[in-house]
A protein has these predicted regions:
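The substrate-binding groove and active-site-proximal loops of carbohydrate-active enzymes
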Residues: 59-64, 158-172, 218-230, 328-338
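Alpha-helix N-cap/helix-start capping residues at coil-to-helix junctions, especially the first residue
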Residues: 129, 135-154, 189, 200-276, ...
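Sec-dependent N-terminal signal peptides
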Residues: 13-21
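N-terminal secretory signal peptides that target proteins for export/translocation
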Residues: 1-12
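N-terminal signal peptide c-region/cleavage motif recognized by signal peptidases
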Residues: 28-30
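C-terminal functional module detector
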Residues: 34-70, 74, 81-114, 119-125, ...
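Alpha-helical scaffolding segments of alpha/beta enzyme cores, especially the outer helices
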Residues: 72-75, 173-181, 234, 238
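Mid-domain alpha/beta scaffold segments of enzyme catalytic cores
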Residues: 137-140, 171, 176-178, 190
Length: 580
């Protein structure tokens, strides 16, 4: 297999100080999928994908006029153009390597019925089919989406109360159709499709959704929905019962938009041993960036917002954008508790054999326009959930273009990609395809000078460390140069996680390549600790600034962010001390 970094630096180039940086002669191969599959080896390929995609089969996409199908979404991910609701055509500048279409399980029945001959004479289908459009989307969203999943308890649509057998049959047939389209698009060694769907838990507008991703074509017979299975424990119990390893079925449940969760779904003080075990098994990842904002971190107090955590924030109350000063101290702390950094910090309290909240990081788009991987700030014109046209999209300018997930996999097959996800050898980006490796050096070995990548532990791994650890961060820029590399360190002591942001390297003019070695001189082997890298690009124009400039109307939006600093977040490496 090709080597991502080969002879990046001569040994003489590495600084004798704790921090060593070299950017001469490095190169990064784009893996050949066919060679990877034909000649498996210890080297891994960096693959790019999107694990959060909606099409017309999701009701919240359909009401805004999305007509594209899962098959259309897969073709778009492979590089084909797609015509959107407003008649414009979009296309990726580079194909993706893998995609999962994750339709909302709750409305597979309704969208199927309304797309079939059964729709004739049904008032709800007539209402949807005649009105669905960017202009009417918000009203239809309130009529059908809000009424089913945002109350204290989920409620089925009236259509399914009146005729549950019709809805059950259509939910099954629609899920089967998604599977068939997913199988038809699968091209092992070139393009992988993963089966999945979204469980849409939203009590009282508090967001605790999970994307369910499967390892193979052995999947649950039904798409598990929030209406029938209204708690995360019920979701896991149903997966335990219907997705068994003996039947070659394995799944992950990936939470997203924890920035909109207001603290729910991650309270562990009253959790049963069974629930803790299920969380450790199923929730090995968290989606930390997508079109509804970034969920990496919040500071301890709202007035302390700084560059550390103030990237693409999307603060909400009952799913509506809200300013930081609108929250009480208690509300702020509750909201902060479900951001990714707080969650993995809380997970440091658990012993090696109990690993809830030990999660790696991914990004995806959450597109509702069947456009996986479409994250280009220069051409993205707003979320499909905002409507079309400048005025509609700019009203929702707090939304983001979305992210991607980078996976270090043995080969481009769904099983190999799933295994990398389960091992957390993955990372998130806010859109750019930034090359990133993060490893714990073996006995202070010089990974920057090595022919291959052979760390003692790599991103996503749990280990036990007895001496001051040396880490290596290898980075290759995408299109925009890299300007800084940081390590975020969390240390568990005095019953809480203490956070540090450590700047390893900063080059304002930017660079295309970097390899950094850093020793943690403050390491305490008695304390559970994690480290993850964060890489930032040079500042570039944000999509909203591009759109308002094209319209000649930027002066109307003086508070709108004009730029952003795109970035990548590596999954952590954990040190968990042995217990007696």
């Amino acid at each position: 297999m090709p080597k991502p970094f080969t002879k990046a630096c001569k040994k003489s180039d590495i600084s004798q100080l704790i921090l060593g940086v070299c950017m001469l002669g490095a190169y990064w191969f784009t893996p050949s999928a066919s060679a990877t599959c034909d000649r498996p080896s210890d080297e891994k390929a960096l693959l790019w994908g999107d694990l959060h995609v909606h099409t017309s089969y999701s009701l919240d996409a359909s009401v805004f006029g999305t007509l594209a199908t899962p098959a259309d979404a897969y073709r778009f991910a492979k590089g084909d153009p797609l015509t959107r609701t407003d008649g414009s055509t979009v296309q990726l500048d580079r194909p993706l390597d893998f995609v999962a279409v994750t339709e909302h399980a709750e409305w597979l029945d309704f969208t199927s019925i309304c797309d079939s001959p059964s729709a004739e004479g049904l008032a709800d289908c007539d209402n949807l089919l005649t009105k669905r459009s960017p202009q009417n989307g918000s009203a239809l969203f309130g009529e059908y989406v809000v009424t089913t999943i945002t109350g204290a308890e989920p409620q089925p649509l009236s259509l399914c109360v009146d005729d549950p057998e019709l809805c059950e049959a259509n939910a099954l047939s629609r899920w089967q159709s998604v599977q068939e389209q997913t199988e038809a698009a699968y091209d092992p060694c070139t393009f992988s499709t993963l089966h999945g769907y979204e469980w849409s838990h939203t009590p009282n507008f508090r967001h605790a959704h999970r994307n369910v991703i499967f390892r193979s074509d052995s999947v649950t017979k039904e798409a598990i929905d929030y209406i029938r299975f209204p708690t995360v424990e019920a979701l896991w119990d149903e997966l335990d019962a219907t997705c068994r390893r003996d039947d070659q079925c394995e799944a992950l449940t990936i939470p997203h938009n924890t920035n909109m969760g207001n603290g729910i779904s991650f309270e562990l003080t009253q959790a049963s041993p069974k629930s803790l075990q299920q969380r450790a098994q199923y929730e090995r990842l968290i989606e930390i960036t997508q079109e509804k904002g970034t969920s990496e971190c919040l500071p301890s107090r709202a007035e302390n917002l700084s560059e550390d955590c103030e990237f693409e924030l999307f603060l909400t109350r009952q799913s509506r954008p809200t300013d930081p000063d609108a929250f009480t101290e208690q509300e702020w702390q509750q909201m902060r508790s479900t951001y990714a950094r707080s969650l993995v910090g809380k997970g440091l309290a658990f012993a090696p054999d109990e690993a809830p909240l030990r999660m790696g990081f991914i990004g995806s788009t959450d597109t509702h326009a069947a456009t996986p991987g479409y994250v280009d700030e220069a051409s993205w014109s707003g979320s499909a959930l905002a409507g079309t046209g400048f005025d509609a999209s700019i009203r929702s300018n707090a939304w983001s273009a979305g992210g991607l997930v980078g996976v270090w996999a043995e080969e481009n097959t769904r099983e190999a990609i799933f295994d990398a996800l389960a091992k957390r050898e993955v990372y998130a980006t806010s859109g750019p395809r930034i090359g990133l490796r993060f490893g714990l050096n073996e006995d202070d070995a010089e990974l920057c000078t090595a022919d291959g990548w052979m760390p003692r532990a790599t991103m996503g791994e749990v280990t036990q460390i007895t001496s001051k650890p040396m880490f290596t961060v290898q980075v290759q820029a995408d299109i925009t140069p890299i300007t800084s590399i940081e390590i975020i360190k969390l240390t568990y002591r005095d019953n809480r996680a203490h956070e540090e942001v450590i700047l390893l390297w900063h080059k304002p003019e930017g660079a295309a390549l970097a390899c950094i070695q850093w020793t943690d001189e403050q390491f305490d082997s008695a304390s559970a600790t994690l480290w993850y890298p964060r890489v930032k690009e040079r500042t570039t124009p944000r999509w909203s600034a591009v759109q308002c400039a094209a319209a000649g109307r930027c002066d109307e939006f003086p508070q709108m962010d004009a730029t952003l600093q795109e970035r990548a977040w590596g999954s952590p490496i954990w040190h968990i001390p042995a217990t007696d």
